[in-house]
UniProtKB/Swiss-Prot annotation:
It comes from Phytophthora infestans. Keywords: Cytoplasm, Glycolysis, NAD, Oxidoreductase. GO terms for biological process: glucose metabolic process; glycolytic process. GO terms for cellular component: cytosol. PANTHER family: GLYCERALDEHYDE 3-PHOSPHATE DEHYDROGENASE, TRIOSEPHOSPHATE ISOMERASE_GLYCERALDEHYDE-3-PHOSPHATE DEHYDROGENASE. InterPro entries: GlycerAld/Erythrose_P_DH, GlycerAld_3-P_DH_AS, GlycerAld_3-P_DH_cat, GlycerAld_3-P_DH_NAD(P)-bd, Glyceraldehyde-3-P_DH_1, NAD(P)-bd_dom_sf. This is Glyceraldehyde-3-phosphate dehydrogenase. The active site is at C149 (nucleophile).
Amino acid sequence: MNVAINGFGRIGRLVLRASAKNPLINIVAINDPFVSTTYMEYMLEYDTVHGKFDGSLSHDETHIFVNGKPIRVFNEMNPENIKWGEEQVQYVVESTGAFTTLEKASTHLKNGVEKVVISAPSSDAPMFVMGVNHELYEKNMHVVSNASCTTNCLAPLAKVVNDKFGIKEGLMTTVHAVTATQKTVDGPSKKDWRGGRGACFNIIPSSTGAAKAVGKVIPSLNGKLTGMSFRVPTADVSVVDLTARLVNPASYDEIKAAIKSASENEMKGILGYTEKAVVSSDFIGDSHSSIFDAEAGIALTDDFVKLVSWYDNEWGYSSRVLDLIEHMVKNE
């Protein structure tokens, strides 16, 4: 499957890194108006969090070469002007963060592209979380969203608990690593004053739509979950805290057993499970969407519990982007 990437930021680069180990995904083109092929090679080779690229890299004026394979590079601002057709592109990963609606993302479809996967939540595109609602994908859907990294962490956990015990209501907090939209030092941020404070020096309360978005992928939970975020000064790996009231009472051990079973069966590779004394950096490079920390959670009563699940908000999410593309291809 010929795939292109629009936007060579954190997710764009990590989708490319992950694809290098996936024989089913053939990245043939990248578009980024601000990055030359020389700089693109450098950005791919060196990564503060994930280390040096494990493979060979080179470039010429119009391509980068990954393990000897040419990847065409475009530098267009407007998706309508990208000549995807010259590289027989079938799928586009839209990872700029700028084209997240059906209308905007659909501009890629004018260039011979069959499908677009938005690597962000969307207000109107069908949204899918692998392991949760991906089976609802239909081949007449040409633009879809892979939701957010936090929704990808929360939704599998919420699905298992809701299917087994029922969730009456819940509040989610994500303790989230720094992202590119934050300021390294205090700077102007008109809409979110706290978000303009230095990311390296503060714990910053922030809003997130991730919990409410779970209601889109699990309709039975619509209106039952909401949440907020704390941005913290770490480079990667975040953690979800889901505090929920259950419909059917259950001991914490019963909840652990249900999640462990799902992690070994229907959600294997999506939902992980650990009872070890882990910390955030232990999950750098973990490809699961969500790793349940059995020893970190607590229960006040049999129907009021706090569940904790980790996620590499970069690598895990990028891995799901490729999984969603694979699923779409199989259902054509």
